[in-house]
A protein has these predicted regions:
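Arg/Lys-rich, positively charged N-terminal/basic patches that mediate binding to nucleic acids
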Residues: 1-33
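Small, basic N-terminal interaction modules of short regulatory proteins
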Residues: 2-15, 38, 77, 93-97
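Short, hydrophobic secondary-structure boundary micro-motifs
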Residues: 29, 51-53, 92
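A generic structural signal for short beta-strands and their flanking turns/coil linkers
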Residues: 32, 39, 56-58
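Basic/aromatic recognition patch in beta-strand/loop cores that engages polyanionic ligands
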Residues: 48-78
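Enriched for short, Lys/Arg-rich terminal
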Residues: 68, 72-97
Length: 97
């Protein structure tokens, strides 16, 4: 099984890391990316670890940061459709596939 991150979700990941680097420090930005990578490995190892959220999609909360990974398992891949801040624009990613 492989992890596929849609372009919009990758942009969100990069934007969040850039925000942490600009407003705090590079170490915090690197910690954010490392936390995302840890979560991605967890999701790949056990795709059903997160609760269902909005139909077939699932939401995995990052431990240290106020972000969630919105994904859904497909036949041979896990598709990440959003790296969503938990307090901003809920559900904006609904149309993504």
């Amino acid at each position: 099984m492989k992890l596929v991150i849609v372009r919009a979700a990758l942009d969100e990941l990069q934007d969040a890391a850039a925000y942490y680097a600009a407003t705090a420090n590079v170490e915090l930005a690197l910690a954010f990316v490392a936390e995302f990578e840890r979560a991605a490995r967890t999701i790949l190892a056990n795709p059903s670890i997160a609760a269902r959220f909005r139909g077939t999609r699932r939401r995995y909360f990052l431990r240290r940061f106020p972000y969630s990974i919105i994904y859904y398992p497909a036949a041979d891949e896990i598709r990440v459709v959003a790296v969503a801040h938990q307090r901003r624009r809920p559900g904006y990613w609904r149309g993504r596939k």
